[in-house]
């Protein structure tokens, strides 16, 4: 990626972690349709590989603003996709895709991090991977830890996530009939792919 700074990429990962970790509340729903968010999306679209995914997400948000009971409908989508059985869902856990659920724990230890007691989900939840990537990008921007060490850990995290993210995204696209979380997951997929190629 060429136009986004490490801090901006960190912010995108943190934002996505938040949206995949729990249902949107009224404040978040208002925020994603705000002018400030439109500016943020414009910035993301300045990165050519992200443009199509951001456009898709913006279209879903525009449709969302005229959807009756939008928050309740999105909550139902979230629950159906991420909290039910895996038969017609996209469970946001590495272990649901036959991946080593201990890998993220090792990566967190290597980064000097641990999961928060406030987050009542297993450590292999998608949001944990995204929070770790956010932390690593912020650390790259600060320059307090050698960049080579952070970059190595970032690549390991991206590789571990890439083992199951495409299948997760495919399931989001298959089972999210409204399309908000499908569009969000597509943006994440493209972001991770770009980040992974930016060695």
From Swiss-Prot:
Q: Does the keyword Lyase apply?
A: no
Q: Name one Pfam family in it.
A: Nitrate_red_del
Q: What InterPro entries does the database record attribute to this sequence? A: Chaperone_TorD, DMSO/NO3_reduct_chaperone, HscB_C_sf, TorD-like_sf, TorD/DmsD_chaperones
GO CC, alphabetical: cytoplasm
Listed under GO biological process in this entry are:
protein complex oligomerization; protein folding
Q: Does the keyword Chaperone apply?
A: yes
The entry sums up its family as follows: Belongs to the TorD/DmsD family. TorD subfamily.
Family annotation (NCBIfam families)? PRK04976.1
Query: What role is this protein assigned?
Result: Involved in the biogenesis of TorA. Acts on TorA before the insertion of the molybdenum cofactor and, as a result, probably favors a conformation of the apoenzyme that is competent for acquiring the cofactor.
The protein's name in its UniProt record: Chaperone protein TorD
Q: What is the lineage of its organism?
A: Bacteria, Pseudomonadati, Pseudomonadota, Gammaproteobacteria, Enterobacterales
């Amino acid at each position: 990626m060429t136009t986004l700074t490490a801090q901006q990429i960190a912010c995108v990962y943190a934002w996505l972690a938040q949206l995949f970790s729990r249902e949107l509340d009224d404040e978040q729903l208002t925020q994603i349709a705000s002018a400030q968010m439109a500016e943020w999306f414009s910035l993301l679209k300045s990165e050519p590989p992200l443009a199509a995914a951001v456009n898709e997400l913006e279209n879903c948000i525009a449709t969302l603003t005229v959807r009756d009971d939008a928050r309740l409908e999105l909550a139902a989508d979230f629950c159906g996709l991420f909290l039910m059985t895996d038969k017609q869902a996209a469970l946001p856990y590495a272990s649901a895709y036959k991946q080593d659920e201990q890998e993220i724990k090792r990566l967190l230890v290597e980064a000097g991090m641990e999961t928060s007691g406030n987050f009542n989900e297993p450590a292999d939840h998608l949001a944990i991977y995204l929070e770790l990537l956010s932390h690593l990008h912020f650390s790259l921007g600060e320059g307090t830890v050698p960049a080579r060490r952070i970059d190595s850990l970032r690549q390991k995290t991206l590789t571990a996530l890439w083992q199951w993210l495409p299948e997760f995204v495919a399931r989001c696209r298959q089972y999210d009939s409204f399309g908000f979380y499908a569009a969000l997951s597509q943006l994440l997929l493209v972001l991770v792919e770009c980040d992974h190629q930016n060695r």
